[in-house]
Amino acid sequence: AQSDAGGRYAGQAQRLERLVNNMMGCQVDFIIRGLDTASRSIVASRKDAMLRKQRTFYLTPAADGLPQIREGRIVQARVTAVAEKSIRLEVFGVECSVLARDLSWEWICDAHERYTVGDVILVRIRSVDVSNPESIRVEADPRSVTDNPLPERLQAVKEQSRYAGQITEVRRGIIYIRLHNGVNAIAHNCLDRRLPAKKDQVSFVVTHINRDQCVAVGIVTRIIRQVL
């Protein structure tokens, strides 16, 4: 039993260490709980600081009788962690994750292309769940605070024309590409003998433009550069 408890503690410690390492460079709030003048060190709690912010911004009505953080509002959020396929945000004391595909109008390969730990960004609040005050949940949307540039960019794309781009994903036989002109594109076929993979640079020929979905449809004719 002691070894099981020790293993759980070691696993938790490793998880906390990874979380802290991922947050390197991020500004955080904390409440001082203790002070040791001899060693010139303090004991502080980030959790307590986040709970205080939650009470202030999510649970306490403002002058209009509504909480400051609510659905539809545009607010600032801190980027606390960045991975290839998602980022983690702190929105006034509540943390949430946003998938890379929901970060911008144009598809991206890696969230590190756009975000770094410590960034402060604007997000639109999609939903807030305060049914359990001990576990408030929020859904944040960074993409919708900017205008969608894709319809205008598609105006410059011509059928049967050739463009270069980067593969952002290969899923279920469909190749997702961000063209260098900022247009999203999909291909179901690749004429190159090599297998296309994420982050490869490719040549793409447009066969159809889907303006409803704001994507160019076509064929990958050649892999210009593979990322191995």
Predicted regions and their residues:
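Single-stranded RNA-binding regions, centering on S1/OB-family and related RNA-binding modules
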Residues: 1-228
